[in-house]
Amino acid sequence: MRRLLGCILLIPMLLQAQQHGSCPLDHYLEEVYENPLYEAWLSKYDVTFYHLSLEVSNMDTYLDGFTSIHVVVAETIDSLLFQLNSELQVSAIEVNDAPASGWRHGDDQLVIPALASTGDHLAVKVHYQGDAGRDRGFFAGITSAYDNTNQQWVTYTLSEPLNARDWFPVKQVLTDKADSVWVDLIVDKELMAGSNGILEEIEDVGGGKHKFKWRSRYPIAYYLVSLAVADYRDYSFQAALSGPGDSVLVQNYIYDDDEYFNRWKSRIDDTGEMITLFSNLVIDYPFAREKYGHAVAPMGGGMEHQTMTTIAAFSFTLVAHELAHQWFGDNITCGNWQDIWINEGFASYFEYVALQNLVSQEEADNWMMYAQLLSFEETGSVYVPAEEAENVNRVFDYGLSYKKGAALIHMIRYELNNDALFYEMLRIYSERYTDSLATAVQFREVLEEVSGMDFSCFFDQWYYGTGYPRFNLVAEEMNDTLYVQSLQEPSTTGTPLFRMHFDLLISTSEGNDTVRLCQEMNEQVFAIPVSGEVYDIRFDPENHLLAKSYAELKLAGGREYAIGPNPFNDRMLLRFRNLAGGEEVKIWNLEGKLVMHTTVTSNPSELNLEGLIDGPYVMVLTGPFGEVRETIFKIGKN
């Protein structure tokens, strides 16, 4: 049973230290990072199409080929700027099929003379070769690595956040999604090459090589364009969508090794169940006309390249995370890197959703407890401050952007208190911003529109603010009323008060009851009607909240102890007013046989009585208060 006691202050505590006031979001929203290249160069045209044609090896990161870029001019220009690593050598450039001259390439910038007016269409073709992936570490745009476990060489890309320039000329601006992308990859015939979209053809180009022609006709952010080259095999199947008979191709490029396939097949197959689940909970898989899939690479995790994730191994939560990005990150991309939560927070939370629906609630709860544990160690905000927007380690902070971001969404679900409404909100959000971008502000607008609730304080505290609350609860029962004094202290000074609901589980001699209370000040007292003798209270019993707590129950009527539930199934809770240490518990059956004898070391203490048969027993408690007897009853589970 759950009772909602609203956001009502039942007994005000007039204390000097109380915190009141509004939740000023504007203070945070003014601090927006601006790319210095954007206003001068990158805002003057829109990219509509990329066509990459590259010869690639799985043994190194050397590239040879061209990239064509189609743009529409947004305002009159005399030149175009693309971003391209200076380690790559540009050999020729054409603009609208005519050779270009006077272009400059340095400081990772390629400037091409091109006189054009607003609305003009330009097709720029850049021929280049070279190696920009050497000694760049994890965040190199292109990497060649040896998988020691599986004895495989793999070349793969990882362009997020600003490394696409390491392997093709590009406009690295999140707000400019290309309408489509073609990727042609020429590799040795014993190799395969994966990329975005549908594989339309494998063409024999002679010389012991063949060309993989990938075509994607969905809008795509620059950093989601990808390639992966290795000695692969294709393992494909269909995954059901939400509609009867609807499905999507799941195409996996895995190492061409029987032992590898047998080891991972069942985990790869989990992908199909997850696609069906997410499609039913939110909207259908966003790129269903093409595919979803994986390309294996020794990258220490995964990267959600649109329609074909690059992945190191098929662990359940990693597969769920990268798949969820197809909805949250690829279909809807964060509008700026400061709002990376739009990508990583949601993908992380859908790890929990997958566990909850496809494994067990217990596994999901364990996942959330670990996410909260990592979040407790952080002092920053989920929102990335403007001064940190170019710090890749801050943008992708695991405790903040991923784990605290997921815990935040879990609390939104709790505040809505209605799972159907939660997923309806995600459906509307996904439909509204499909093939586009969104910020946290835009997500909050949808959340408030669908729920009819005001989440401004919530975002001020949990998204833009820092830290978490600590609750200290002291409860005492008097005259059928449980008085709960709740003192909230922040973990950081950045957020002095978290206005929030919390559940309180109250266990009495007549059963359990959960009430939902609302903390509006740092210190409050709640008066809660109860029936029966209270023997235990628990803060946030289902672990919805990113909060630490301590709860103390003062026993009613001067009693030295309380027990419950009674009757019990397998376990009983024992609480002393003051635990001196050394208190003893003995339980006798009606035949006079001692069936349990233990010394109490914790307060409260849980007694495991599952070995007892159903029926009455006599419990004898011994301590500084003397010796007392209670009749207890075990009943079987219904």
Residue ranges and their predicted role:
Residues 555-579, 588-594, 614, 632-638:
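Surface-exposed, proline-anchored Ser/Thr-rich loop/turn motifs
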Residues 90-94, 471, 476-520, 526-538, ...:
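Beta-strand-rich binding/interaction modules
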Residues 600-629, 635-638:
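Short, surface-exposed loop/turn motifs with a glycine/proline- and acidic-biased composition
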